[in-house]
Amino acid sequence: SVGITMNLENQEWNTFLNTRKAGDYSVARNGWVADYNDPICFLDMWISSSGNNDVQFGKGDHATVKAYSLDLTPYGLDTKVENGTWAETYDVLISAIKSCTDNDNRYAMMHIAEDMLMDTGCIVPLYFYTDIYMLDDSVHGFFSNPLGYKYFYKCDVDGKTDSINVCIASEPDVLDPALNSAVDGATLDSHLFAGLAKWDTSADGKLEIVADCAESLPEGVVNEDGTVTYTYTLRDGLKWSDGQDLKASDFVFAWKRAASEELGADYGYMFENVKGYPNDLAVEATDDKTIVVTLNNAVAYWDELLAFPAYFPVREDVVANEGWCTDASTFVSNGAYKMTGWDHNSVITLTKNDHYWDAENVTMKEIKFYLSDDTNNMLTNFKNGDWLLIDEVPTNEIATLKTEYPTEFVVAGQIGTYYVCWNINENLLP
């Protein structure tokens, strides 16, 4: 015996999510799915200001611990720290990686960040994600992306487009796109909102990032100081689901809100590449159709960020109502669908939004997202034909399902990893 008492607890997902955010745990089996196609998204979540930093690096008592060293002089930077805090070393390292335009140096510094994380002993990678789901053979036009988001707007059910019933998860924690930090919430938000860019499939079925509310996704202009400026023109006639005009200023408000220290969003750091982050973002609406944003430096995955929920627009007068995103009657969005029903812990109903700029290419008229985390219940409804997609199956049924449903049992690639994490502020030794 080592004299340690261990209490094991299996929590419902949203409870587990908030327990980890609050640091109210000692050890947890965790997972992370990429937010865009670049390794930095597995590293920047551990900076001290990140809301996704469940290990609590640089938070609480750990904020003042001086135990870390950093030397970036081999990469042409005037940074050398001995016995510094997490913020003085790891946070500085991540910032340097994000501003680095030399690919070799950038990857070398990412290896340093990985080594720093592993040396703490607080993160133990287990295995990589695969996205397992069941999709009925009658469904056509469905696609998912490497981040795990599911898309139904192009679907038909053996040619019928009236409605589709699916189950991707239980009750979402939050559907405010600035505050969401879960894959199921991102799937819902990606149907309800439209950013400057979106994930789509080409004619040959390949995934791609394409313009959504923006007319196009132009190249940035490199300024003399190394910053990069992008100018986006919105499509004509953009509207919110309640019929009001959508303006460039709505994007500016949404981005500044999402990045602000006042909101304290988990994904606020996703705007770190924008000049003036966090409280003075260099983004402006020069007129109702034009958005100008300046980045600190070139960012290879910038277009992917524009398709990420944190970059979706919200309207200032709508979000002034604190409970706006918890009820269909107050939920205002600008995407392919509008919310027309939310029976909490039962079902969320999305109906085609005729105000969406590309509504003529939205095939499915209604999507019912049934809410459950009971995998046996999910499988029963799939077998009965009631739910045409379920995003999880009972582990003990996998071998059987592979055999009995060879075309409907899907194992898709996903950019993510499972790991065990320790709360760095917990003293676990007796």
Regions found by a protein language model. Give the residues of each.
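A bilobed periplasmic-binding-protein/Venus flytrap-type ligand-binding module shared by bacterial periplasmic
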Residues: 129-130, 199-200, 235, 351-355, ...
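N-terminal lobe/hinge region of extracytoplasmic solute-binding protein
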Residues: 167-222, 332
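Gly/Pro-rich hinge or "lid" segments in bacterial periplasmic/extracellular proteins
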Residues: 183, 187-190, 194, 198-204, ...
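Aromatic- and charge-enriched surface segment that lines or borders ligand/interaction sites
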Residues: 215-265, 292, 381
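Surface-exposed binding/hinge segments that line
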Residues: 231-233, 267-317
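Alpha-helical secondary-structure segments
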Residues: 101-119, 165, 247-254, 288-294, ...
